[in-house]
Curated annotation (Swiss-Prot):
Its EC number is 6.5.1.2. The gene is ligA. One of its GO terms (biological process) is DNA repair. Its cofactor is Mg(2+); Mn(2+). Belongs to the NAD-dependent DNA ligase family. LigA subfamily. InterPro entries: BRCT_dom, BRCT_dom_sf, DisA/LigA_HHH, DNA_ligase, DNA_ligase_AS, DNA_ligase_CS, DNAligase_adenylation, DNAligase_N. HAMAP family: DNA_ligase_A. The keyword Ligase applies. This is DNA ligase. It comes from Streptococcus pyogenes serotype M12 (strain MGAS2096). Keywords: DNA damage, DNA repair, DNA replication, Ligase, Magnesium, Manganese, Metal-binding, NAD, Zinc. Residues 577-652 form the BRCT domain. The active site is at residue 109.
Amino acid sequence: MKKRIKELTDLLNRYRYDYYTKDAPSVSDSDYDKLYRELVTLEQSYPEYVLQDSPTQQVGGTILKGFEKYRHQYPLFSLQDAFSREELDAFDKRVKAEFPNATYLAELKIDGLSISLSYENGFLQVGATRGDGNIGENITENIKKIKDIPHQLSEPLTITVRGEAYMSRQSFKAINEARQENGETEFANPRNAAAGTLRQLDTSVVAKRQLATFLYQEASPTARNQQNEVLAELAGLGFSVNPYYQLTSSMDEIWDFIKTIEAKRDQLAYDIDGVVIKVNSLAMQEELGFTVKAPRWAIAYKFPAEEKEAEILSVDWTVGRTGVVTPTANLTPVQLAGTTVSRATLHNVDYIAEKDIRIGDTVIVYKAGDIIPAVLNVVMSKRNQQEVMLIPKLCPSCGSELVHFEDEVALRCINPLCPSLIQRSLEHFASRDAMNITGLGPAIVEKLFLAGFVHDVADIYQLTKENFMQLDGIKEKSADKLLAAIEASKSNSAEKLLFGLGIRHIGSKVSRLILEVYGDISALLTAKEEEIARIDGLGSTIAQSLTQYFEQKTAAILVDELKTAGVNMHYSGQKVNSDAALFGLTVVLTGKLNQLNRNEAKDKLEALGAKVTGSVSKKTDLVIAGSDAGSKLEKAKSLGIRIEDEDWLRQL
């Protein structure tokens, strides 16, 4: 082992010299990483043989075993997208209906990776990725290699901030030139390069690639009152803040700002993909609140996507887990937004009819949201044949007759025994955001289904090693890993299970909101529609969908089978008490409190199930008024809102 450690040390040091001194990498990142991992493992087992010049002992580079999960104290939400002036005007109308005097701050939407930075007494403690908004990955060591992120703030604050890590166009060009010379695959775009860099296990590679950041939000409570004040404070603390933003109450001025930025987009040193418009007042932001997925006080205008022409060669029709049959066009390959595109969604049959899309047509292809390739329209001037699109009447999977409901745009297979529907449901159940059964992907699900081993999600927990070993291509080691992943999934918190059941309108975030109140899957079997609709962030559509699902006898049977198999039914997060005195009420504190300070009062209200906001509106249910209460109290009286005092609150 001593000899192997010496060999690895010498070899890796030579590679490091080629990479950092000569700027001419002589080995791929993946090969370097494998050798580095081997050295770390050997050094941990035989510490007496660690050499002084080992790359693991060098300042400026640390090899990481992997990235630990990190639960965000303050969740990261996605933003609602807008693609037109009309959508921005609709957003403005919604906001101004609540706050006629609202102003907006328009900021650039950096095309990078969302990061969260937590400081304690001014010192950086954790840097994390966004992940699913609730759980990301701890990448602190890599974050520390980004030069413009301060390790110590100019003030000893305990604070969590948010921003975007990105790679400049200059750095991206240099990296791809080096990768090309070394025979490595080039990165498709700066965003992909930044993502790959932040997940490097060798931190010295992160330092070499020169990522940068722009910070834009204080996620933890702040003394600032306006978003533009937050940006100023972040800059004062030592963070990089993007210099391009505009404060205005006029959507016309915001549109002018968008067009100005769009015109100079190519002159910037970094990629942007739009402009984010935020309500500037933090109190108004708090009052407007959130939907399940996004804040109501912000919207992201996305620049028009790059468009290319391609020919439709054929169309595939596939059945999803809810029975919806989706058409996908097979295209002549085109380069689009840094990737080769040969397939694009046609959305649904109504879309095909509306656009008169036919096989053989030349069409305009773009990436919806810069992610999903889609067909925009037909280039009619290039139509040279009249082959009409054949809309299927029978399910491509089971042969059952497809239905087209009046209130829907898609074809649907309503056969509960449809093989594709069952397989998609099983795939969804095993997916990362659901039960996260590692290795149980589409290919293995299909083999299990065709072999007759699984027909619903409960069957997954009855699988044996022998079942897996009978599948083509599955060896003993793989079977053991799959069984271990299935066993591990039993202990997931119940919101994962609820999402995995694939109920219409019940996404991962909605699942968490529901179980924060009900606490257990079994409780949903008797939950009332009106009770569910009261949960903040939900509504009648979600409540109806959930109750309709659990009213079915098959749902009760499935829950019982899963419970018998040992699958956890309990929510492991902090539960909201739906029996609390103020559950579901929106409450505003105003005036001076004599016995409780403001934070104590807020904590008590939240413990009683209330949502505490900063300003009074028609959505407010209750105002707690202390002495010297001013305009908020007067507004509450004018709106006929219930008003109580501090003594009333203390007695609850």
